[in-house]
Amino acid sequence: MHVIRRMTRVVSTVAMVAGIATPMAVEAVRATPSAASVNAGSIAIGYENNGADPSIISVANKYFQREMGHDVRLKLFTSGPAALTSLASGQLPFMCGLGMPPVIAAIAQGVPLQVVFNQERYTKDAGLVVKTSSGIKSVAGLAGKSVGLVIGSQSSFELATYARKAGLNLSSVRLVNLTPPELQSAWATGRIEAAVVWDPVYDFLVTHGGRVLMDDSKLPVTATSFNICVANKSFASKHPAVARAFVKALGDGVSYLQNHRTAALGVMAKAAGISVATAKVEIAGYQIYSVSDQATAAVLGTSSATSATSGTAQSLLNNWRALYRAGTITTRTPKSAGPFVNPNYAK
């Protein structure tokens, strides 16, 4: 799944993320990189600013360079759909911070992607926010209202799930397709009365005249929103050591959060352009997965043979069914999502 709180401040802050000079970042630069990237060439990694998130620690502290070599280029995207062209062209062998729908859209178009790291499950950091002045009291009350969302992202799936449970026909809702920064602006100008979005814009709406109507904690695990990292299957199979180093770098971010929580909150706040207090609230709204969690039944599966029954694969299938029903994608849901989930690089 996911982007900008104080727009001008954050855009400039995030643009400099790769050069943030925290003590840990300096240490990471001085460390000898692994040999994983030998013969792999220049490596591009895409990511999103999802607010307080362990992957932003890996970016800020230069763990990708430490684990994969110095010839790593980081590219910021404002949303998952915005990254699809680069993913489809093969320019990005790795991408983080994605929701399921953009990944499904890419796979449906024949892009050889696999989920290699499930970063976290949203619980309190994403959902449906309504303006207190709108008079909307329930999901059914969205009929005739303007709702902002990133069509083709996790927000499409969440809104469809909320609507189905409430018996709301989405054809009665005025859907406004916006990027997260545009969504924040539309909220401020009164163009929309409700929104389905994730942090940090989610928190902005809540603190600027919004009320949470539904959040992801109300959804079952297999229907909820995840931030996931994908690899180009062709690239990763040719360079498995690079893929393992990529996963290791992500795990380093989680470990830093677990072992240096106060410092980690400061790193995430600076990188995401938010306050430490906000970072603390946001990180509490996730169920975060470490490297050791990846190869378990609840996350990616214990092996390639069991990946199809993993929590991530089941969520992917449920997202796919919802997107197909909504007409967002025209490719029928496959019988199994096992081929699109790979726990082996986390072992």
Residue ranges with predicted function:
Residues 33-169, 174-177, 193:
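Short, glycine-/small- and polar/acidic-enriched structural segments
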Residues 67-68, 91, 96-99, 107, ...:
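Sec/Tat-exported extracytoplasmic proteins
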Residues 101, 176, 181-272:
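Pocket-lining segment of extracytoplasmic ligand-binding domains
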Residues 170-173, 273-284, 329-337:
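Short, surface-exposed acidic
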Residues 238-326:
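Secondary-structure end/capping motifs
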Residues 316-347:
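Conserved C-terminal helix/tail region of periplasmic/extracytoplasmic solute-binding proteins
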